[in-house]
């Protein structure tokens, strides 16, 4: 009988670990900062109401990296809605227009790409030349920043083109945002009248089709969960993701996670972001 009681006690002692294998989100973020020897910025926002559910360094500046490409394509779609652009318009470019990491655009030097194809390449494959070609259509970095101001984002700024914008110097405000500002801007693009319903669906679909985000939150996503995302990476340990997430294949919340100033490898950075994502998912109903 004593042996049975000891077995039951031992089993009960393991139950909390089985129920909650991941720490609470803020505890996970603190652990990640310690393990990365860097800074983590994060916000979890309810998509419908805009209410902040979890935040850590949410008002501190972090390099945007390639996450800016979602906002860029939002600006392109706003021009489409206004009748100033067409997704079917073909853009031709030359070899000298290509920059590092252009896996899609480098294959279309002969025939060019449509505006819609460039947006798909910029978001789903993070094609840098596609982003630069699109930036030119909205007035460059200054034009994109002006668009952000027009929709009420007074924080996010783009100052340079790909690939210089990924320098990520400590304390440099250029090409930065805050988790809170990025989440609010993404919510405006996807839920307000800043974009037509058709353009909102298109922007979201490009994020659903992201093909370079596998090692991050997608790696810990349970079956039946929805995700649409865009990642970014830069020098000096910068890494980031903007995502829409939710169970029952429904986008319920916006999650923005940025890392900066860490000596960690790319694999380690990916692992920490995945860990934060796992904590959010496990404690979704907190």
Swiss-Prot record:
InterPro entries: Beta-lactam/transpept-like, Beta-lactam_cat, Beta-lactam_class-A, Beta-lactam_class-A_AS
SS bond list: 73-119
Leader sequence segment: 1-21
Catalytic activity annotation: a beta-lactam + H2O = a substituted beta-amino acid
More details: The class A beta-lactamase family has a specific amino-acid numbering system, sometimes called Ambler or ABL numbering and often misspelt as Amber. A multiple sequence alignment was used to derive a consensus sequence and then the consensus was numbered taking into account insertions and deletions. This allows use of identical numbers, e.g. for active site residues, despite differences in protein length. UniProt always uses natural numbering of residues, hence there appear to be differences in numbering between this entry and some papers.
Enzyme class, broadest EC rank: hydrolase
Superkingdom, natural source: Bacteria
Molecular-function GO terms, alphabetical: beta-lactamase activity
Residues where substrate binds: 230-232
Family to which this protein belongs: Belongs to the class-A beta-lactamase family.
Enzyme nomenclature, EC number: 3.5.2.6
One of the GO BP terms on file: beta-lactam antibiotic catabolic process
Organism: Klebsiella pneumoniae
Active-site residues annotated for this sequence: 66, 164
Pfam families on file: Beta-lactamase2 (PF13354)
Alphabetical UniProt keywords: Antibiotic resistance, Disulfide bond, Hydrolase, Signal
Keyword Hydrolase annotated: yes
Protein name in UniProt: Beta-lactamase SHV-29
Transmembrane segments: none
